[in-house]
Amino acid sequence: MPVKCISVLLLLLQLSCCFSSGSCGKVLVWPMEFSHWMNMKTILDALVQQGHEVTVLRSSASIVIGSNNESGIKFETFHTSYRKDEIENFFMDWFYKMIYNVSIESYWETFSLTKMVILKYSDICEDICKEVILNKKLMTKLQESRFDVVLADPVSPGGELLAELLKIPLVYSLRGFVGYMLQKHGGGLLLPPSYVPVMMSGLGSQMTFMERVQNLLCVLYFDFWFPKFNEKRWDQFYSEVLGRPVTFLELMGKADMWLIRSYWDLEFPRPLLPNFDFIGGLHCKPAKPLPQEMEDFVQSSGEEGVVVFSLGSMISNLTEERANVIASALAQLPQKVLWRFEGKKPDMLGSNTRLYKWIPQNDLLGHPKTKAFITHGGANGVFEAIYHGIPMVGLPLFGDQLDNIVYMKAKGAAVKLNLKTMSSADLLNALKTVINDPSYKENAMTLSRIHHDQPMKPLDRAVFWIEYVMRHKGAKHLRVAAHDLTWYQYHSLDVIGFLLACVAITTYLIVKCCLLVYRYVLGAGKKKKRD
């Protein structure tokens, strides 16, 4: 009993210190589904541990948000006209088309499909956002709650409008967006196309002349033809709600902080702004012990070790033909294989391969017997592999996955294959390469050391910036003046025009003076001749 009393007293003391120091705040969260939520939840758990009150806005159609009883996180559920299966089918249909109907390496096929999906998704987000903003009871409750900051994922628009209506600071958390459009046009980030490969281009930093041409064409396409959601509709909606002309990008530009889920172990060097910071790998942690059955299987591999294979949480199965191509290659490995797979058991499955509906991926990648990781290139899995120093075989499917694998290949830590066209021999040779060529393991370990050699852990950095914004009631002192300029002022076209006009006028006056002098001299000469 005394021990319990002491524990309670210590807890109360900790809470009292937190409140007395004024460091505890109230965070309102506007989230996004799937892996976006997994990353966001990691930040929210850390905020709760720091004593902050976290409230997540979730619709009644949410797929994974709040699906488990997350301790310490409050959920404010609002009704939406959409059903959960409608939203889920929309995403699954997109995933299926991206995997089986188009080639990720065919830009125009991928961009065209992504454009259609973004426009449809934009309409869904707008409807859901309206159901929140026009819900007077909910909005009154949010205003009375006196939140200190909105933490939002800009891939799901609406958070910026909430922050504006509640008159509180805004912090974004995201991995990226097609063509870096949100970071560039919403955040004011400078991305020179001469050496910064645009997102979804699949290009590296050391670009040839033709690759730079290709990169510039991609930039122009994204800037002028690709939608940043259904921008006109969002502009109109935001203007109606706020009662003044305003644009979607203008409100995005008011964000106090952009927390980008990346880091220099993955990215190529490029410019950043003061209110941008990298928090990539925030979910990574030291490996925990495996379940006993799984540990026994891993240990049975002996000195050969194991290969971990997962295509992420959104891809549960494959076609029978592709599954058998993969199974045939895996069966020829001396290593044991742990494959996350929910489809029909492949006929070619070898005795060295076990199928699992779920695997503790981080713990497996951190196991000393793990030799390689077969991945679709999702940022979460790539960062876990970097964290533990595991070389990869990449089978990118959609989104930023191609870029992630291309970056890892350029850094000598991965081999890239095409899931739709590869043969069993291709996969087998790729695995043998990353396992038997020591340079891949060495490069992976180099990236791991870079990742671990940070003054502050990524998760701690994310929490710091959110608390920083709450403490200072924003971070406008980190926001560049570019947001206050028109497009022609930003590119100094007015200054260039003024200077050209000055040069033209000066040139005109000089020429005019020369002509006058010439005429005067010529006239004087003729007069002398007549005299």
UniProtKB/Swiss-Prot annotation:
GO terms for cellular component: endoplasmic reticulum membrane. The chain crosses the membrane at residues 495-511. Its EC number is 2.4.1.17. It is an enzyme of class 2 (transferase). It is found in: Microsome membrane; Endoplasmic reticulum membrane. One of its GO terms (molecular function) is glucuronosyltransferase activity. Keywords: Endoplasmic reticulum, Glycoprotein, Glycosyltransferase, Membrane, Microsome, Signal, Transferase, Transmembrane, Transmembrane helix. Glycans are attached at N69, N101, N317. It is a single-pass membrane protein. Pfam families: UDPGT. It catalyses: glucuronate acceptor + UDP-alpha-D-glucuronate = acceptor beta-D-glucuronoside + UDP + H(+). Residues 1-24 form the signal peptide. Its main location: membrane. UDPGT is of major importance in the conjugation and subsequent elimination of potentially toxic xenobiotics and endogenous compounds. Acts on small phenolic agents such as 2-beta-naphthol and 4-methylumbelliferone as well as bulky phenolic compounds like 2-hydroxy- and 4-hydroxybiphenyl. In contrast to 2B16 it is active toward octylgallate. Belongs to the UDP-glycosyltransferase family. This is UDP-glucuronosyltransferase 2B13. The lineage of its organism: Eukaryota, Metazoa, Chordata, Craniata, Vertebrata. The gene is UGT2B13.
